[in-house]
């Protein structure tokens, strides 16, 4: 029985996994070949990244593998970063290859191949594991599955969402191009506004995620009557954990949020528009779910931060503060 890994729009099943003793032998040879790519201060973290990739109890998801590759690239000396290469053999988003080349740039030391529904990891030509992705079911439209393909973007030095694939039951797959998301970022770059846009969007997007987590937990614990002050404290403490301050000045009217970019790109596609019209009862909730999923991936590609993890942090923070408040109230009642 295959092991299922991951959540969200993609779940993975292990098809092939090498024995641990074989993995250890390959890892030792790999580490000897690449350890000098890193400064002494980065070697320990690079070693941990490789261990997570190759020895984790559960094989990393597609997204985590991508993160590890780019973390290793960031840790490498500037003179060695050219060895960390992203290759699109078909010049589309059907296949992305992330690879580390040897000193002569002739042989692949590490290769991560990501196809539409499978991804694999090879060490010096030896297959470490092969995983199969299966699209997740849309919560708002249970008769449909969704998958978001990605293509490497030089602007963010990370794969960005490039195609949305929707598969309605008993109907052909609907492919919606998302390339114009990168176009928005390129426009900001060309104007010289990209850094300012990023600083503004990071704070705005995460604040919205934190607020969403607070509201979600408040709804779940509606019987507990969580006070406004507890909710506000949870919001501020989560913002502080993320190194953010509460926004005193709203974004300028020229600022285009990620969610607006994504929505405009989706609705610019006439086929997608027509598809929404065919089922008006669920179209808005489905659109909102898809926009959030794509936006989260765009944000993650730009900032290397998982917005869902931040939202979860806010949920846990509110629960913790509420429980603490209840305990203190109980102690006070006992004292009185």
Swiss-Prot record:
Keyword Cell cycle among record annotations: no
Record's superkingdom? Bacteria
Annotated region Interaction with host PLEKHM2: the residues are 1-330
Give the induction annotation: Very highly expressed in host macrophages and when grown in an acidic environment; repressed by H-NS and induced by SsrB. Repressed in conditions of high calcium and by osmotic stress.
Q: Which UniProt keywords apply?
A: Host cell membrane, Host cytoplasm, Host membrane, Membrane, Secreted, Virulence
List the subcellular locations: Secreted; Host cytoplasm; Host cell membrane
Function, as annotated: Effector proteins function to alter host cell physiology and promote bacterial survival in host tissues. This protein is required for endosomal tubulation and formation of Salmonella-induced filaments (Sifs), which are filamentous structures containing lysosomal membrane glycoproteins within epithelial cells. Sif formation is concomitant with intracellular bacterial replication.
Similarity comment: family membership:
Belongs to the Sif family.
Domains: what does the record tell us? Domains throughout the protein, and not only the N-terminus, are required for secretion and translocation. Both N- and C-terminal domains are also required for formation of tubules.
- Which named protein is this? Secreted effector protein SifA
Q: Which gene encodes it?
A: sifA
């Amino acid at each position: 029985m295959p092991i299922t890994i991951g959540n969200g729009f993609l779940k993975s099943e292990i098809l092939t996994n090498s024995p641990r003793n074989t993995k250890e032998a390959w890892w030792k040879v790999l580490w000897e070949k690449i350890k000098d790519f890193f400064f002494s201060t980065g070697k320990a973290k690079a070693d941990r990244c490789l261990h997570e990739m190759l020895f984790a109890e559960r094989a990393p998801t597609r997204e985590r593998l991508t993160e590890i590759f780019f973390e290793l690239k960031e840790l490498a000396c500037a003179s060695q970063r050219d060895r960390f290469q992203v290759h699109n053999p078909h010049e589309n988003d059907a296949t992305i290859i992330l690879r580390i080349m040897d000193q002569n740039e002739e042989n692949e030391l590490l290769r991560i191949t990501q196809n539409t529904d499978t991804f694999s990891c090879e060490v010096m030509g030896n297959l470490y594991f092969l995983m199969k992705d299966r699209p997740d079911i849309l919560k708002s439209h249970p008769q449909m599955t969704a998958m978001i393909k990605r293509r490497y973007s030089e602007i963010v030095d990370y794969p960005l969402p490039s195609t949305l694939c929707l598969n309605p039951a008993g109907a052909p797959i609907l492919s919606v191009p998302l390339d114009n998301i990168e176009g928005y970022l390129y426009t900001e770059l060309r104007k010289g506004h990209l850094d300012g846009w990023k600083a503004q969007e990071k704070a705005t997007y995460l604040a919205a995620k934190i607020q969403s987590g607070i509201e979600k937990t408040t709804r779940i614990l509606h019987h507990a009557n969580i006070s406004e002050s507890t909710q506000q404290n949870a919001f501020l403490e989560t913002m502080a954990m993320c190194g953010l301050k509460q926004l005193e000045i709203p974004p300028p009217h020229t600022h285009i949020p990620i969610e607006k970019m994504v929505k405009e790109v989706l609705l610019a596609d006439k086929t997608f528009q027509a598809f929404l019209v065919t089922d008006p009862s669920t179209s808005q909730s489905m659109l909102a779910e898809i926009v959030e999923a794509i936006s989260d991936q765009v944000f993650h590609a730009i900032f290397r931060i998982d917005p869902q993890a931040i939202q979860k942090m806010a949920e846990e923070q509110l629960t913790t503060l509420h429980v603490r408040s209840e305990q203190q109230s109980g102690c006070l009642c006992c004292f009185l």
